[in-house]
Amino acid sequence: MEQSFLAYLRGRTRQLPQVAVGIGDDAAVIDWPGSVSSDQPQLRQVACTDQILDGVDFRSEEQSLSDIGFKAMAINLSDIAAMGATPSSALVTLALPAENATEIAGEVYEGILEAAQKYQVAIAGGDLSTYDGPLSISITILGWTEQPWLRTGAEEGDALFVTGALGGSLLGRHLRPEPRVELAAKLKQTVNVHAAIDVSDGFSLDLDRMLAASRMGAELELETLPISEAAHQFAEKSGRTPLEHAWSDGEDFELIFCVAPEEAAIIESTDWGVPVTRVGKVVGRTGLWKRVATSKFERVFPQGFVHGETDVAAAN
C-alpha cells in the first residue's frame, strides 16, 4: 500500500522550485532561497519524518518507553545518514494516552533526549496532545548537506557496499538502532557516493528500491553478505537460514551505497570503525542476480516488510 500511495501522491502534489527532491527518497531536499555566495558552499536543507504507533511499530507493554523514544529518533537519523546529510534539529509530536500522560511523556523523552545528545541534534519544538488512544510518536528531523545522496544516482559498474551486519534485529537490535550518521560523514569526506539508502524494510527490498529508482540492477555475491550473530541465533528457532534473515529482516538501519569501481579499494582499505562490506556491483539489466558460477547468475527476488501488505516475492 505504501509504495502505491506514494506514487499517487507524486502525481497529485505540486513540485515547487524550492523542493529539489520530493516524495520518494529517504528524505526531502529543500534549497535555500537567494543567491549563492562565491566563497561559501550552498547548503541544502534535508528533512525527513517518521511516525511510530503503539501496537503497530512497537508494544509499550513489552518495551521500555525510553527505548521507544530513542528508536523514534534513530529511525529518522538513519534516513538523514542515507542522504549523506548532517542532522541539526528535530520537531517532536506526541499523541499520548490520557491516562498517565505526563509520566509517559517523561519516559519517552528520556530516550529522545539521549539520542539527541548522542547525535548532537537540538530539540527545536513540537507538540503534545492527549486522547483516548495508543501512544503515537512523530518526529521530523532537519539536516543539511552541500550535495545529497539520492537513490537515483547508481551507475552501471558501480561497486555495491553495505555497512554493519544484517538480520535478526528482532532479537533486540531493533530496540536501540545505531544510525550510521558518523560513518556517513566520513564517507562523504573520503569518496563520491553515487546512490544510497538505509535498510529499514529488509536488505534485498531496500536495495531493489534504490536500484529501481536508478533504473539499474545488481549482480550479488551472496556469500559475502555480512550476517549478524543474531541472525544465526534467530535461525535456530525460525526454520529459516541465517542468509534468509540477512536477506529480508527489517530494521537493521544499516546503509547500502555504491561508488565508482575505482573507489572501491579506498572503501576496502579504510578503517571505518564498523564493517563495510562489498556485496556486488551495479549492472544495466534490472533486477537482483546472484552468482551461481564463475560467469553465471540467477535471478533472485527481494523480500521484506511492505507497509500495508504481507510480503513480496520469495527470495529464492
Swiss-Prot record:
Keywords, alphabetical: ATP-binding, Kinase, Magnesium, Metal-binding, Nucleotide-binding, Thiamine biosynthesis, Transferase
Binding-site positions, Mg(2+) 5: D201
Binding site for Mg(2+) 1: T49, D50, D127
The protein's annotated pathway: Cofactor biosynthesis; thiamine diphosphate biosynthesis; thiamine diphosphate from thiamine phosphate: step 1/1
Catalytic activity: thiamine phosphate + ATP = thiamine diphosphate + ADP
GO biological process: thiamine biosynthetic process; thiamine diphosphate biosynthetic process
Entry keyword Cell wall biogenesis/degradation: no
Ligand binding (Mg(2+) 2): D50, D79
Binding site for substrate: D57, E251, F305
Positions with a binding annotation for Mg(2+) 4: D26, D79
Domain of life where this protein originates: Bacteria
Residue sites binding Mg(2+) 3 per the record: D26, D79, D198
Pfam families with a match to the protein in the record: AIRS, AIRS_C
UniProt cross-references to Gene3D superfamilies, sorted A to Z: PurM-like C-terminal domain, PurM-like, N-terminal domain
UniProt-listed Enzyme Commission number(s): 2.7.4.16
GO MF annotation, one: thiamine-phosphate kinase activity
Binding site for ATP: Y109, G126, D127, R151, S200
Family: Belongs to the thiamine-monophosphate kinase family.
PANTHER family (alphabetical): THIAMINE-MONOPHOSPHATE KINASE
Role: Catalyzes the ATP-dependent phosphorylation of thiamine-monophosphate (TMP) to form thiamine-pyrophosphate (TPP), the active form of vitamin B1.
Extra remark beyond the main annotation: Reaction mechanism of ThiL seems to utilize a direct, inline transfer of the gamma-phosphate of ATP to TMP rather than a phosphorylated enzyme intermediate.
NCBIfam families membership: thiL
UniProt-recorded name of the protein: Thiamine-monophosphate kinase
Biological source species: Rhodopirellula baltica (strain DSM 10527 / NCIMB 13988 / SH1)
